[in-house]
Amino acid sequence: MTNRISRLKTALFSNTREISLERALLYTASHRQTEGEPVILRRAKATAYILEHVEISIRDEELIAGNRTVKPRAGIMSPEMDPYWLLKELDQFPTRPQDRFAISEEDKRIYREELFPYWEKRSMKDFINGQMTDEVKAATSTQIFSINQTDKGQGHIIIDYPRLLNHGLGELVAQMQQHCQQQPENHFYQAALLLLEASQKHILRYAELAETMAANCTDAQRREELLTIAEISRHNAEHKPQTFWQACQLFWYMNIILQYESNASSLSLGRFDQYMLPFYQASLTQGEDPAFLKELLESLWVKCNDIVLLRSTSSARYFAGFPTGYTALLDGLTENGRSAVNVLSFLCLDAYQSVQLPQPNLGVRTNALIDTPFLMKTAETIRLGTGIPQIFNDEVVVPAFLNRGVSLEDARDYSVVGCVELSIPGRTYGLHDIAMFNLLKVMEICLHENEGNAALTYEGLLEQIRAKISHYITLMVEGSNICDIGHRDWAPVPLLSSFISDCLEKGRDITDGGARYNFSGVQGIGIANLSDSLHALKGMVFEQQRLSFDELLSVLKANFATPEGEKVRARLINRFEKYGNDIDEVDNISAELLRHYCKEVEKYQNPRGGYFTPGSYTVSAHVPLGSVVGATPDGRFAGEQLADGGLSPMLGQDAQGPTAVLKSVSKLDNTLLSNGTLLNVKFTPATLEGEAGLRKLADFLRAFTQLKLQHIQFNVVNADTLREAQQRPQDYAGLVVRVAGYSAFFVELSKEIQDDIIRRTAHQL
């Protein structure tokens, strides 16, 4: 890492995070002037107004220009989506447990007196709340499931970066002008053209700023850099990039612009090493210094950490630590099925090893053809302990997409949005994180409904759980589809849609079914706890008959605080096998019930003509979802977290080592889980030391691939180090750990999430 990159890193995190009202004020100012116009045009005009008037900056020593806010890592508001939680939490932002932000008293006053009164009763949240039935509201209030993305832009998508970079904005504007001429009444085309032209003007503002700064700069080297930024910006406003610097700059400008349009999470990066390779090679051919090109890439990686998301207190518990979702996958397959590793794949990991920040959320695609040197480079990067890169298995994911009707060529081109959500870049609107389903809460409801049922059998209970899962899935689908319609009718994204295949051919926004592939992704959470609980209950009550069902239920209701409660809990924990130890009897319960969940989910259609797709990952939702579930037959206390990750074993229950964990997860139908899965594994640093440690990790990754698991990620850290960081956070400000599908600064996580990471089983190989 160069001195420049070190200073850029330091500067990014040297100030307190603040809330900026600038986007909200500009958006509102435009919106006041467009009453009565079509929603998609109002949205486009508001975004264009932001691009014209928002304050811009180029920070000291930056090689890549473009900042969403002048101050680093500032949160921005989108009251047009949901003004109510913002009003409620204005005074809580600086002191809340997770994701704190400073906000001035003047900004609070402006929000209360100007922004909230305008958006009250005219936001997307008002529409969604007005459509939700009482039954759906009751289920979400008890957290049987959650409906997400009701308060902000949807995101969770990858635009067609090759189209942007290989054609350039000038050509794209010309194409959109033709569409407008052919269909002059089409509001989508009008909105997209308006925003493409506004993007050009916004980029030219940076060119002018760089020229002004250069004229006043006394340092010769920095003056030349600023003039180059100006030249690149003027070129990118009209023409396609020719060099790596130009490509990186246009790539980042578009990321910033899309943030203004929707303020959404997980506007992910796709297969960066594939579409950026021609520009990197062109720069090498032109004689550019490889060391400088690496510094450019490191600059871009640092920039990815400048965007943080302002979430509600509740949402921050589900998505703790700013998982912005700048996810990029490396390697994988070419369109003809060969290994896709290239020189830029290596450079992306090298640059990450230098910066070691939470974003970008890099991943590596493995398969039977994976290049051994690149596998070793991957293992070397994992060993650093930041949880990056995560690993995805082509041997599972490609068939999973084929099973959903995706073409073979498109399936081989898959990438990931957000944490682990599977998507086809530039062709999919997957609504990937629309809902989370609390499987353990459903079991708890069934247990309580059977109190006093002397005729209850294990098979009868299992059938009731299946039926109840099916029932609540119908409600989850109902709520998800209402949210889907809310985004269509209140929050279209015409600029983003112009970079998604088939939207231009159809003349429709992605929210209106314009994309080639239209999914709605929902996550089943708690399968490990569910199977552990049912296995223990079956043994304790129905086979060994040590307690009656009502006696066990009484102990659970008391949270094990009965005269025999601790003995009962010890037996439940220690005498009955747990998922994650390669024991068929309990693993098969997981497999059967998760398959039931998947098959039920995939029955349903969304308003865009696509189907629901199941996944199993938690982000950090295993903590809040566990908080609403009482004590359970796996020995879990009331309110205790669920198993992390999605497919990970419960904390402390994976006693037979990491290979046994792989074997347990391999018994699940990973192919059905086409919205993504998540498996966390924690290693002690000592087990990966030296060349031998790297080879052991590489072999473990090959075993993961051969066993046909879909996803795996790692923490490589000592629990003692994490405990020290809790006590002395000022000494561990740069400590990055894996949470669930993303990495975060350990000291920026709430204590409950920190404790969760500390408690995860640390394995040895």
Label each region the model flagged.
Residues 190-201:
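Extended non-globular scaffold/tether segments
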Residues 214-221:
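A conserved hydrophobic secondary-structure block that centers on an alpha-helix together
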Residues 203-211, 273-277:
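Extended amphipathic alpha-helical scaffold segments
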Residues 2-189, 225-228, 232-765:
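Conserved catalytic cores of very large enzyme subunits
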